[in-house]
């Protein structure tokens, strides 16, 4: 062999190796692996619910802490509580990813699920701002589920169902981001909303934000119990032998689904030098920033007054839009995305989705000119299409990220992506809120007005489209096409 061929470590089959066992199961299994997909769905939902459940009541929670000297300061403190989770996750995602690559996916999933039970419950029992922000930060530090479950989803099913398994992660996460606010909105302050059921002297009267946290923690407990039967996918008990192999053979083996024939390679080059991986992570971060900024802006825009270009929706109206779009998202991901990805390819789906989102977002300000049934019909259709395109982007990037690295580095690779994404997402909500407020204050300004051609917040959606355009351009980085 040539001198530049790298020294690698080879793993031979072992009857007791959990990774080898799952590989044999994949080879023997026929049909859709519903059991494995169910595990993936449950864990993905568990990681999404705590993130979004506090948004409907965080304003009132901060108000009841009496830390804000005036009402205008409540949003300032609420922003710190919201961002503390992402900061904690950004600090520890790489650490958890490396542990998952060393000790396996299952123990890390169990730790992450258990942390939801503990810290999410404590958050609902918080009686001060500093306790709430500390518990939220710790929840982010131990919430290692999303990155690990993405790596797990790509390994537990055969190559044929890879797109389906990762689309289940995206769909469950999307549903969780819709169910979370519903749980928080309906169950917070139950003694005030449902006095016939909950008295002011009960624990739910003394801790008005405990019930939504308790419901999510009970669900997390059920997931923790179910995960005891979760099969491990990491090759942890194979015999190690030194050998030489051309690095291209590793990529060829992984592209065939990561299964073991006679030997399995473990090679750990620096992930930071993996240019296709770094390119995918950069694109993922840009689209994640745009997505979370849109989520923040959409809620503010929908409930704002029509004089500011909003829809004058109630919280119930917004909830209905989110619920309908969530149902449409579920149908799209399970029935439409897998055959679409197979027919046109991953990169084509990502680029097509990014292109179509730009004219769609450009239409949003003009939807505010509608009213009545027409308004509700159009905004629901637009929301379904927007979520379907966004999830197509995310799912495609998930798959390409896992294809960019061998199995024994997928945990660390997803940890790096989670760290970078969490950093970007920590700026998204605050940036989106500032942008929205700035645009509303400049409705009639002569320079960079909030409205341009119509009494709508066009400037807000213009900025969102600029971020979307940057992400689209970045998909043409040459290294990304190498993953196909």
Curated annotation (Swiss-Prot):
Pfam families, alphabetized: MFS_1 (PF07690)
GO MF annotation: an example: transmembrane transporter activity
Membrane topology: Multi-pass membrane protein
The keyword Transmembrane helix is annotated on this UniProt entry: yes
Lineage summary: Eukaryota, Viridiplantae, Streptophyta, Embryophyta, Tracheophyta
CDD domains, per database record: MFS_SLC46_TetA_like (cd17330)
Gene transcribed to yield this protein: ZIFL2
GO biological process: response to nematode
Protein name, UniProt field: Probable peptide/nitrate transporter At3g43790
């Amino acid at each position: 062999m040539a001198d530049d061929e790298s020294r690698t470590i080879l793993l031979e089959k072992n009857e007791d190796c959990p990774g080898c066992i799952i590989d044999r199961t994949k080879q023997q299994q026929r049909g859709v692996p519903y059991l494995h997909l169910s595990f993936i769905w449950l864990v993905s939902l568990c990681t999404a619910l705590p993130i979004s459940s506090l948004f409907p009541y965080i304003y009132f929670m901060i108000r009841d802490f009496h830390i804000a000297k005036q009402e205008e300061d409540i949003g300032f403190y609420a922003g710190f509580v919201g961002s503390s989770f992402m900061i904690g996750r950004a600090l520890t995602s790489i650490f958890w990813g490396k542990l998952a690559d060393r000790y396996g996916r299952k123990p890390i999933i169990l730790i992450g699920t258990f942390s939801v039970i503990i810290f999410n419950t404590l958050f609902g029992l918080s009686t001060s701002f500093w306790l709430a922000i500390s518990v939220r930060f710790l929840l982010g530090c131990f919430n290692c589920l999303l990155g690990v479950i993405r790596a797990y989803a790509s390994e537990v099913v055969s190559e044929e169902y890879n797109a389906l398994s990762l689309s289940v992660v995206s769909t469950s996460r999307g549903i969780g981001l819709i169910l979370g606010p519903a749980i928080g909105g309906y169950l917070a302050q139950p003694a005030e909303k449902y006095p016939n059921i909950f008295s002011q002297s009960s624990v739910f009267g003394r801790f008005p934000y405990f019930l939504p946290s308790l419901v999510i923690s009970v669900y997390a407990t059920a997931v923790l119990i179910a995960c005891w039967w979760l099969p491990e996918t990491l090759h942890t008990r194979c015999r190690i032998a030194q050998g030489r192999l051309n690095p291209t053979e590793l990529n060829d083996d992984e592209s065939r689904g990561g299964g073991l024939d006679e030997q399995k390679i473990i090679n750990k080059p620096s992930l930071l030098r993996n240019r296709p991986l770094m390119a995918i992570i950069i694109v993922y971060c840009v689209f994640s920033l745009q997505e979370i900024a849109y989520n923040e802006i959409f809620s503010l825009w929908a409930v704002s007054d029509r004089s500011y270009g909003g829809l004058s929706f109630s919280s119930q109206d917004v909830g209905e839009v989110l619920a309908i779009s969530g149902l449409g998202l579920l149908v799209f991901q399970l029935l439409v995305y897998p055959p679409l990805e197979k027919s046109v390819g991953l990169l084509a789906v990502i680029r097509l989705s990014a292109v179509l989102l730009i004219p769609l977002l450009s239409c949003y300000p003009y939807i505010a000119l509608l009213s009545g049934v027409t308004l509700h019909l159009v905004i629901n259709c637009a929301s379904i299409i927007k979520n379907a395109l966004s999830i197509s982007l995310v799912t495609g990037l998930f798959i390409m990220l896992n294809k960019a690295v061998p199995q024994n580095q997928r945990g660390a690779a997803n940890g790096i992506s989670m760290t970078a994404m969490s950093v970007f997402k920590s700026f998204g909500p605050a940036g989106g809120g500032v942008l929205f407020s700035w645009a509303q204050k400049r409705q009639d300004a002569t320079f960079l007005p909030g409205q341009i051609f119509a009494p709508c917040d066009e400037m807000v959606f213009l900025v969102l489209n600029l971020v979307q355009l940057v992400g689209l351009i970045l998909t043409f980085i040459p290294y990304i096409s190498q993953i196909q």
